[in-house]
């Protein structure tokens, strides 16, 4: 089976469109060390992981994605325990 590659996106700023700052996103940030982003529709999980690691100088443990009913792609990014999602949120200006 041929290996699939994601889109050729050079700049990590092009992958992550904007952070989500809803009540649920804040609860996930505090309880599960997860950040929530709206990302490009054609971005895959390895590309999202690489973009978050490059932009925020953190290590990512896991990425979950979904397509919202409005057609946007949402990514839940779980950071490794030695990094805090709240610190990244402060840098983003959402906390």
UniProtKB/Swiss-Prot annotation:
<dbReference type="GO" id="GO:0003735">
    <property type="term" value="F:structural constituent of ribosome"/>
</dbReference>
<dbReference type="InterPro" id="IPR001014">
    <property type="entry name" value="Ribosomal_uL23_CS"/>
</dbReference>
<dbReference type="GO" id="GO:0019843">
    <property type="term" value="F:rRNA binding"/>
</dbReference>
<comment type="similarity">
    <text>Belongs to the universal ribosomal protein uL23 family.</text>
</comment>
<protein>
    <recommendedName>
        <fullName>Large ribosomal subunit protein uL23</fullName>
    </recommendedName>
</protein>
<dbReference type="GO" id="GO:0006412">
    <property type="term" value="P:translation"/>
</dbReference>
<dbReference type="GO" id="GO:1990904">
    <property type="term" value="C:ribonucleoprotein complex"/>
</dbReference>
<keyword id="KW-0699">rRNA-binding</keyword>
<dbReference type="InterPro" id="IPR012677">
    <property type="entry name" value="Nucleotide-bd_a/b_plait_sf"/>
</dbReference>
<keyword id="KW-0694">RNA-binding</keyword>
<dbReference type="InterPro" id="IPR012678">
    <property type="entry name" value="Ribosomal_uL23/eL15/eS24_sf"/>
</dbReference>
<keyword id="KW-0689">Ribosomal protein</keyword>
<dbReference type="InterPro" id="IPR019985">
    <property type="entry name" value="Ribosomal_uL23"/>
</dbReference>
<dbReference type="Pfam" id="PF00276">
    <property type="entry name" value="Ribosomal_L23"/>
</dbReference>
<keyword id="KW-0687">Ribonucleoprotein</keyword>
<comment type="function">
    <text>Binds to 23S rRNA. One of the proteins that surrounds the polypeptide exit tunnel on the outside of the ribosome.</text>
</comment>
<dbReference type="InterPro" id="IPR013025">
    <property type="entry name" value="Ribosomal_uL23-like"/>
</dbReference>
<comment type="subunit">
    <text>Part of the 50S ribosomal subunit. Contacts protein L29.</text>
</comment>
<dbReference type="GO" id="GO:0005840">
    <property type="term" value="C:ribosome"/>
</dbReference>
